[in-house]
């Protein structure tokens, strides 16, 4: 008998039939799938739609189930109960009497009919399960005792529990509650869609196999077909006889069937050729189309140049004459095409007189030689969509430009207009979807065929183990989003894993060439049955054989040690007693002893194994693993895919398989334990009488979305221990210094290697600065790490920038004098090229010229580095030949010529390295102290032996004599440097940071001091994204976290949030608002209740689905906002007008799992905010609060953060979906030319109070209920990001004093060796005195007394952190009773008398606050203008500004503005490409709207000036 298929309408599932399926599936092959209606298909011609008919049919064909009773009397009784459940029990009026009758019948029975379960029980139970009244009785414990007992007895059984959970219709037959929250994206509600009236279509071209991109289109259309109970048309687009092949039609139909898609109608575009031709002739007669014989290339050029064709003004008669030639297929006709007469000057290329018909004389697969002219797809599609009744045409965004053409054709012909909805095309990394390119692979024999598992075809991915359900879930998760992204295949396979993991049986296979026998001396040969799946008993049992000899993986055996206890999966603990090895040290066998009584499996190694048994022979199997066919993740538009072919993409391994593998059938999916999931591609065949050989079971590996390799041996615990041991063993111990007497050849190699590492480091930095693709950066980093490892192996020490090994230095120092001359010449070239680059940047030269100059500079630097062995440093030309003494000889002081002294010298240097490494790795204090003690002892030994102190050698071989001098000069150099604002300041700072960081010499015995990258390496005006990332990390505001989109707010940034919180909290309390806290978790029911409100958040809601390893009965959401949590409580608390107003606020965190690229502060998945929610008796009270709160938000920005904002109201399109209107404050970031929403305050009207029933008795009309008026308002940590973007410069943060946690930093200067201890202590005391005095004046102050950093380093550090004022004090200042204050905002230095410290600094801080606000206000003023036309507005946008434009307020118009202002793809790289959106309708516009003014769209009168711009 053929397999049956039960189709279930998820909105109204037939529980009776589903229960019957559960009880007969052991006897009958039947599948269940979702569809539009409840239907059991028996064959192509026979199907049942009546539920009772389905039940009877299933019970009769599964005779052993006994569901239809055992005799005629029971048949009759069962029929009675089927009718009873469909009539009496389903009627609300008769429910009580029906339940009484049922209770009476069950008083002495376990089942309704006979002594076993029958259809009667299934049907009645299902009806009660779906009855809201019955469910209410159950909750209130009002049910009759016998019915309740019977209902509970059945509900506890596995089949009822399974169906009842998966298809939960409790009280509502139209609700589906899956086991857990489905991972689905947001599906747009189709405009104008009505239940039962939606018609969609899937129109593939029969020119190839369907691939996964087509599958997305088909499944999306099916989604709307099913959800709207509509109609799906499968239409073959056969408008091109050259490409159309009948063979492919059959293939596509098979592919569609594989996807379980059932179209309601099959059609061909060719069915309508006559009609389409008539429409074409109508356009010719109306002068809306013309025939053109311009050659194709010339036509293309004319369209690009917007030049009209010479035939465009032909008469209708001339056009008809040429059209007839086309229809005949004459020589002249073949050179012609029919073109629409639209607009050759249009900005949209698709509107420049597109081709409607072309002449092709090839025979058509369906119409033969009947026609010689064929319509283009773009002309035929809108006509056929209209004729066939398509209501909604779903198309990928690549057709976006053609939408205007689609609608023009509809309007020109006067036919019915379908609605077009766009969704994103599926772009997959390492994949080509072009039919032409896929055909090339097949023709070249690089793949096995169109169903090759490496292919993205439907057949290919299904053969590789993709399930239709997994594919559906993946498509559902994408939703109908328009965001075009390149996706990794891992995402698809991860969805697939969710489908196969719960049901795939577990088996074992071992790598045949590496198996090791284990002799378990006390084991007996026997067989036991164990679960095929450890967590799903429904998968069944499998036989497992045990014997005295078993086989394990060689990789596992290598991890064992004698005496170790190992867990053999499905057996128990076994002790390894002996390990036998051959002469090569390879393990040949193991001896073991059972220890099954020991049940402690927590820290043992878990391994798989197979027994040697004559009763169950191991099955030969071949595991096939496939890799991507294309090695490059994303191919450029003009790149040749053939250059990136992976010639080694298929790997096979011969395995020793589980005996159970002999029963696998083609297409069965299993999991090989500790190897992954596999699909059976070819079942095992026993020895053939023809070939005398057995055919192995071919298994194809199914990717599961993980990015790390599967563990192949040992356990996690053991692996951790092994790694720990390795790290311990590799920790620095006392070791001899690397030999100094290297050969010349070795020194030469290390020098070249050092240069190669340095050059590769520059390459990596350049790629990161350019925001190159991740794969390019990863490849460069990998090469860098390889070079570093090679360098370490060659020299015996780590690579350090600016510190080449002794061997490398030796090479440099022994170069000939001619090399020195070359080095000097190269040095001068680098310096000259640097000047060229700086000049080009200063002149704002084109990016291409700057890039070319920079590349030339990098090339010269690399050449200089290779020649000299060190980095190019401005102001440090290469030393002459005679100045480079040999560092090896220099390393030995004059009195240290003895060999033992040389060895001891090297040991001291080596131990110094150990100390530095331990400190860098933040090792424990004990370890560092121990290493330091050893270093001191070695130094003492050296002094005792040689009579002189040990002195380290610098990287160049000369002692660092000038280090103290440099440190002393650092302050004066910094002070004398002219400081400018903005660019100048940034450039100076970056230079000073670069040179100042290494100014402090090395400590004794520690060699040269390591350079640290303290300053910013990106400029705000050149690379805003990289600059922003560096500012927030280097200023210690943010620490990145291992969960994407979540960040650690360090004290430096959290203190800003505290300042905002303190101010705002105090102000709202003055208004009568109280603080509270509501739970972070939201029930699914609460969220669903307000699904319209949370629609925008739906794809971003994060769900908790498990407690430990236990699935929750119902998933729980983490709040994206708190309306759904708070308002039900409001409804309880508000009973009378006296209970109003309710004004609550909470400071909390929320989670919105955005799929967009996260940015700290600006767009994060978890963020801190305050959310206020109020309820009032009148509209006016709520409206007053909306504006009061908005003004407080404006004060936060303007008074605390020194950022000017524009106050206004959101447009209808941009307002909060659940509110009446939304007010907002908008800030502007000139560095990006974009605005950013600062905070919003919403008037919710009565929308939520109606939803949550927040009602009170009207005091004016007793007995009449009124709904409360509500408002909500929120401010987030985004404020901090805005502050960074607005005020930050190329030196780092600039903090407004009112939110700075440190307003003044005190830094002691002038501490030198010449300074006496008394003076040093006096200076420190003076610094602390300033601290006490300023704290007394309520100035937040910190003193930096760290003695391991120079003053110059500290200056840079605190400038980077944005501290408003730096207070410098030195010995001379103390004598003069004064100090120097340096402003962060301007760099201005002020000399202030000590006695005026408090008053003057308070004044300086206020001046800084005012200056920052004034500067930002001027910035906003110059970047916000009025534009009255779209053309002017576009220019304003391109200049990086925002504009107030006359606007009608219509949503369609706003969409049009956004579309028209979006940049094309060919603009300069890095420019913002998104269209402009409305920011707000300003309360105080820049100018008044003139009477009669029109909206920029030119269609409607303008209602108000509205601020538009590109936005974050």
Swiss-Prot record:
EC number annotated for this UniProt entry: 6.1.1.17, 6.1.1.15
Residue ranges of the motif 'KMSKS' region: 432-436
Region of interest (Proline--tRNA ligase), ranges: 1007-1512
Biased composition regions of type Polar residues, renumbered to the chain: 808-819, 878-892
Modification type Phosphotyrosine: residues: 872
Record has Cell membrane as a keyword: no
UniProt PTM comment: Phosphorylated at Ser-999 by RPS6KB1; triggers EPRS1 release from the aminoacyl-tRNA synthetase multienzyme complex. In monocytes, the IFN-gamma-induced phosphorylation at Ser-999 releases EPRS1 from the aminoacyl-tRNA synthetase multienzyme complex, allowing its association with the GAIT complex. Phosphorylation at Ser-999 is specifically required for the RPL13A-mediated interaction of the GAIT complex with eIF4G. Phosphorylation at Ser-999 by RPS6KB1, is also induced by insulin through activation of the mTORC1 signaling pathway and promotes the interaction of EPRS1 with SLC27A1.
Modified residues (Omega-N-methylarginine): 1152
GO process terms (BP): cellular response to insulin stimulus; cellular response to type II interferon; glutamyl-tRNA aminoacylation; negative regulation of translation; prolyl-tRNA aminoacylation; regulation of long-chain fatty acid import into cell
Domain (WHEP-TRS): residue spans on this chain: 749-805, 822-878, 900-956
Residues bearing the modification Phosphoserine: 434, 885, 998-999, 1350
Stretch list, region Glutamate--tRNA ligase: 164-759
Family that this chain belongs to: In the N-terminal section; belongs to the class-I aminoacyl-tRNA synthetase family. Glutamate--tRNA ligase type 2 subfamily. In the C-terminal section; belongs to the class-II aminoacyl-tRNA synthetase family.
Subunit structure comment from the entry: Homodimer. Part of the aminoacyl-tRNA synthetase multienzyme complex, also know as multisynthetase complex, that is composed of the tRNA ligases for Arg (RARS1), Asp (DARS1), Gln (QARS1), Ile (IARS1), Leu (LARS1), Lys (KARS1), Met (MARS1) the bifunctional ligase for Glu and Pro (EPRS1) and the auxiliary subunits AIMP1/p43, AIMP2/p38 and EEF1E1/p18. Forms a linear complex that contains MARS1, EEF1E1, EPRS1 and AIMP2 that is at the core of the multisubunit complex. Interacts with TARS3. Interacts with DUS2L. Component of the GAIT complex which is composed of EPRS1, RPL13A and GAPDH.
Protein name: Bifunctional glutamate/proline--tRNA ligase
Organism of origin: Mus musculus
Organism taxonomic ancestry: Eukaryota, Metazoa, Chordata, Craniata, Vertebrata
Gene: Eprs1
């Amino acid at each position: 008998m053929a397999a049956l298929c039960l189709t279930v309408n998820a909105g109204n599932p037939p529980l009776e039939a589903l229960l019957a399926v559960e009880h007969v599936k052991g006897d009958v092959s039947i599948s269940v799938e979702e569809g539009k209606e409840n239907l059991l298909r028996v064959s192509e011609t026979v199907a049942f739609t009546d539920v009772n008919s389905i039940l009877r049919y299933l019970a009769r064909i599964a005779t052993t189930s006994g569901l239809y009773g055992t005799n005629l009397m029971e048949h009759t009784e069962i029929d009675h109960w089927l009718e009873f459940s469909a009539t009496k029990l389903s009627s609300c009026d008769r429910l009580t009497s029906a339940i009484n009758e049922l209770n009476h019948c069950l008083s002495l029975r376990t089942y309704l009919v006979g002594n076993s379960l029958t259809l009667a029980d299934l049907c009645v139970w299902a009806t009660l399960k779906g009855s809201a009244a019955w469910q209410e009785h159950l909750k209130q414990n009002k049910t009759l005792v016998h019915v309740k007992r019977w209902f509970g007895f059945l509900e506890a059984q596995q089949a009822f529990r399974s169906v009842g959970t998966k298809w939960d219709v409790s009280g509502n037959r139209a609700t589906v509650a899956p086991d857990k929250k489905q991972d689905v994206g947001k599906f747009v509600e189709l405009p104008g869609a009505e239940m039962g009236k939606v018609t969609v279509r899937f129109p593939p071209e029969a020119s190839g196999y369907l691939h996964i991109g087509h599958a997305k289109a088909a499944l999306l259309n099916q989604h709307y077909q099913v959800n709207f109970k509509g109609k799906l048309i499968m239409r073959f687009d056969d408008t091109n006889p050259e490409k159309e092949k009948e063979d492919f039609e059959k293939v596509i139909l098979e592919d569609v069937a594989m996807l379980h898609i059932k179209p309601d109608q099959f059609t061909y575009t060719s069915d309508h050729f006559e009609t389409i031709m008539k429409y074409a002739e109508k356009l010719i007669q109306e002068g809306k189309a013309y025939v053109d014989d311009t050659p194709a290339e010339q036509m293309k050029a004319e369209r690009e140049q917007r030049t009209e064709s010479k035939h465009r003004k032909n008469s209708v008669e001339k056009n008809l004459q040429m059209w007839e030639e086309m229809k005949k297929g004459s020589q002249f006709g073949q050179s012609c095409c029919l073109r629409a007469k639209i607009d050759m000057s249009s900005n949209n290329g698709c509107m420049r007189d597109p081709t409607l018909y072309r002449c092709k004389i090839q025979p058509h697969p369906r119409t033969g030689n009947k026609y010689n002219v064929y319509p283009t797809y773009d002309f035929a599609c809108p006509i056929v969509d209209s004729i066939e009744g398509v209501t909604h045409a779903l198309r990928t965004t690549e057709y976006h430009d053609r939408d205007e053409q689609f609608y023009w054709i509809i309007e020109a012909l006067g036919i019915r207009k379908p609605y077009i909805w766009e969704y994103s095309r599926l772009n997959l990394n390492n994949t080509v979807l072009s039919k032409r390119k896929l055909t090339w692979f097949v023709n070249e024999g690089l793949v096995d065929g169109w169903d090759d598992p490496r292919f993205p075809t439907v057949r290919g991915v299904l053969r590789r183990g993709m399930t239709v359900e997994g594919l559906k879930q993946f498509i559902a998760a994408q939703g109908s989003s328009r965001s075009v992204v390149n996706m990794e295949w891992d995402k698809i396979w991860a969805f697939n894993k969710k489908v196969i993991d719960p049901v795939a049986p577990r088996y074992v296979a071992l790598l045949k060439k590496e198996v090791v026998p284990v002799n378990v001396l006390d084991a007996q040969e026997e067989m036991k049955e164990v679960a095929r799946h450890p967590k799903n008993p429904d998968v069944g049992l499998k036989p497992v054989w045990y014997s005295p000899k078993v086989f394990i993986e060689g990789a596992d055996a290598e991890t064992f040690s004698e005496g170790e206890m190992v867990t053999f999966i499905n057996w128990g603990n076994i002790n390894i007693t002996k390990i036998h090895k051959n002469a090569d040290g390879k393990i040949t066998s193991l001896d073991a002893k059972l220890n099954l009584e020991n049940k402690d499996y927590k820290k043992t190694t878990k391994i798989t194994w197979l027994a040697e048994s004559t009763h169950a022979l191991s099955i030969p199997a071949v595991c096939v693993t496939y890799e991507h066919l294309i090695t490059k993740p994303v191919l450029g538009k003009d790149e040749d895919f053939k250059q990136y072919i992976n010639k080694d993409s298929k790997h096979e391994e011969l395995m020793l398989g589980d005996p159970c593998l002999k029963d696998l059938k083609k297409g069965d999916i299993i999991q090989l334990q500790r190897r992954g999931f596999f699909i059976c591609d070819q079942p095992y065949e026993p020895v053939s009488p023809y070939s005398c050989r057995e055919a192995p079971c071919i298994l194809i590996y199914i990717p599961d979305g993980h990015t790390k390799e599967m563990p192949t041996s040992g356990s996690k615990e053991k692996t951790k221990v092994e790694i720990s041991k390795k790290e311990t063993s590799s920790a620095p111990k006392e070791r001899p210094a690397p030999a100094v007497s290297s050969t010349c050849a070795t020194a030469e190699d290390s020098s070249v290697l050092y240069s190669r590492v340095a050059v590769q480091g520059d390459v990596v930095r350049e790629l990161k600065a350019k925001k190159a693709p991740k794969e390019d950066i990863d490849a460069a980093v990998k090469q860098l790490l390889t070079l570093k490892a090679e360098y370490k192996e060659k020299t015996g020490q780590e690579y350090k920038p600016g510190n080449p090994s002794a061997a490398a230095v030796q090479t440099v120092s022994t170069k000939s004098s001619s090399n020195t001359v070359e080095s000097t010449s190269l040095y001068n070239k680098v310096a000259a090229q640097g000047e060229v680059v700086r000049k080009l940047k200063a002149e704002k030269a084109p990016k291409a010229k700057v890039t070319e100059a920079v590349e030339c500079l990098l090339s010269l630097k690399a050449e200089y580095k290779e020649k000299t062995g060190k980095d190019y440093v401005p102001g440090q030309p290469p030393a002459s030949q005679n100045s480079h003494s040999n560092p090896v000889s220099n390393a030995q002081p004059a009195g240290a010529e003895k060999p033992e002294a040389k060895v001891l010298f090297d040991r001291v240097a080596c131990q110094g390295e150990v100390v530095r490494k331990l400190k860098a790795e933040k090792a424990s204090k004990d370890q560092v102290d121990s290493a330091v003690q050893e270093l001191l002892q070695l130094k003492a030994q050296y002094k005792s032996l040689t009579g002189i102190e040990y002195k380290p050698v610098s990287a160049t071989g000369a002692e660092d004599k000038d280090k103290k001098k440099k440190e002393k000069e650092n302050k004066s150099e910094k002070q004398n440097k002219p400081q400018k604002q903005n660019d100048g300041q940034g450039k100076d700072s970056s230079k000073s940071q670069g040179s100042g960081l290494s100014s402090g010499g090395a400590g004794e015995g520690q060699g040269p001091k390591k350079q640290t990258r303290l300053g910013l390496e990106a400029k705000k005006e050149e690379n805003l994204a990289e600059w922003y990332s560096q500012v927030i990390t280097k200023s210690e505001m943010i620490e990145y976290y291992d969960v994407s989109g979540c960040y650690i707010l360090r004290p430096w940034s959290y203190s800003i949030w505290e300042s905002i919180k303190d101010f705002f909290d105090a102000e709202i309390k003055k208004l009568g608002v109280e603080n509270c806290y509501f739970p972070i978790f939201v029930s699914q029911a609460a969220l669903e209740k307000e699904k319209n409100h949370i629609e925008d958040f739906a794809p971003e809601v994060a769900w908790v689905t498990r407690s430990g390893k236990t699935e929750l009965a119902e998933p729980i959401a983490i709040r994206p906002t708190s309306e759904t949590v708070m308002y039900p409580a409001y409804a309880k608390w508000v009973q009378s007008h006296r209970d109003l107003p309710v004004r609550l606020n909470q400071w909390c965190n929320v989670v919105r799992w955005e799929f967009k690229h996260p940015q700290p502060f600006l767009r994060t998945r978890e963020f801190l905010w305050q959310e206020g929610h109020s309820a009032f008796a009148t509209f006016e009270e709520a409206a007053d609060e909306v504006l009061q709160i908005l003004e407080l938000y404006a004060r936060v920005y303007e008074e605390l953060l020194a950022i000017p904002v524009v106050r206004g109201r959101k447009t209808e399109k941009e307002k909060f979906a659940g509110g009446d209107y939304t007010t907002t404050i908008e800030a502007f970031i000139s560095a990006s030319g974009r605005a950013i929403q600062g905070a919003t305050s919403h008037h919710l009207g009565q929308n939520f109070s109606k939803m949550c029933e927040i009602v009170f008795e009207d005091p004016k009309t007793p007995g009449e209920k009124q709904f409360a008026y509500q408002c909500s308002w929120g401010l987030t940590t985004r404020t901090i990001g805005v502050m960074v973007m607005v005020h930050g410069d190329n030196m780092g943060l600039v903090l407004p004093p009112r939110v700075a946690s440190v307003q003044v930093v005190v830094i002691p200067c002038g501490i030198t060796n010449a300074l006496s201890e008394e003076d040093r202590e006096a200076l420190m005391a003076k610094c602390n005195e300033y601290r006490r005095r300023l704290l007394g004046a309520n100035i937040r102050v910190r003193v930096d007394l760290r003695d391991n950093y120079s003053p110059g380093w500290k200056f840079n550090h605190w400038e980077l952190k944005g501290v408003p004022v730096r207070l410098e004090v030195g010995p001379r200042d103390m004598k003069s009773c004064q100090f120097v204050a340096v402003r962060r905002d301007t760099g201005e230095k002020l000399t202030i008398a000590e006695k005026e410290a408090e008053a003057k600094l308070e004044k300086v801080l206020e001046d800084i606050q005012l200056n920052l606000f004034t500067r930002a206000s001027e910035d906003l003023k110059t970047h916000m203008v009025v534009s009255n036309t779209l053309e002017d507005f576009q220019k304003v946008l391109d200049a990086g500004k925002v504009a107030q434009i006359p606007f009608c307020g219509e949503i369609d118009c706003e969409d049009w503005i956004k579309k028209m202002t979006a940049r094309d793809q060919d603009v300069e790289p890095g420019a913002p490409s998104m269209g402009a959106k409305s920011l707000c309708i300003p309360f105080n516009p820049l100018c008044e709207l003139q009477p009669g003014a029109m909206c920029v769209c030119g269609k409607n009168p303008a209602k108000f000036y509205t601020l538009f711009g590109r936005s974050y």
